[in-house]
Amino acid sequence: MTERTLVLIKPDGVQRLLVGEIISRIERKGLAIAALELRNVTEELASQHYAEHEGKPFFGSLLEFITSAPVVAAIVEGPRAIAAFRQLAGGTDPVEKATPGTIRGDFGLETQFNLVHGSDSAESAQREIALWFPSA
């Protein structure tokens, strides 16, 4: 069954010129890019995207980071796309939890600056795709 997931290449990934490497890894995994856009993130979009973290101590710095520079937003499709991309991304903490061979394990240094976001469930993917690609 084909799934769709939202993938974000965060400001650190864009600024470090890792977009091509990350997209290549997604495609080599057998996933397809259905939509792709480089965009600036408004505080409103960031707040909606990260609504589950509102009230947590890191919420303000998370919004500041994601709105600090452009991100690449993509709809990625394929069999088990959600789990496949999350495996490809690696653990949230790039140093302690992400294994070598994953995007975060190979390129990440800090939890907040962990290069990519991928939806964590079918429900999240549907909500996030609607936020980032309203006409999709």
From Swiss-Prot:
Cited HAMAP family: NDP_kinase
Molecular function in Gene Ontology: ATP binding; metal ion binding; nucleoside diphosphate kinase activity
Gene that encodes the chain: ndk
PROSITE patterns: NDPK_LIKE (PS51374)
Cofactor(s) of this protein: Mg(2+)
Record flagged with keyword Ribosomal protein: no
Enzyme class name: transferase
Primary residence: cytoplasm
Membership in a protein family: Belongs to the NDK family.
Superkingdom of the organism of origin: Bacteria
Catalytic activity: a 2'-deoxyribonucleoside 5'-diphosphate + ATP = a 2'-deoxyribonucleoside 5'-triphosphate + ADP; a ribonucleoside 5'-diphosphate + ATP = a ribonucleoside 5'-triphosphate + ADP
EC number, as in UniProt: 2.7.4.6
UniProt keywords, alphabetically: ATP-binding, Cytoplasm, Kinase, Magnesium, Metal-binding, Nucleotide metabolism, Nucleotide-binding, Phosphoprotein, Transferase
Active site per database record: H117 (pros-phosphohistidine intermediate)
Cited function: Major role in the synthesis of nucleoside triphosphates other than ATP. The ATP gamma phosphate is transferred to the NDP beta phosphate via a ping-pong mechanism, using a phosphorylated active-site intermediate.
Binding site for ATP: K10, F58, R86, T92, R104, N114
Protein name in the entry: Nucleoside diphosphate kinase
Subcellular location: Cytoplasm
Quaternary context: Homotetramer.
Cellular component terms per the entry's GO annotation: cytoplasm
One GO BP: CTP biosynthetic process
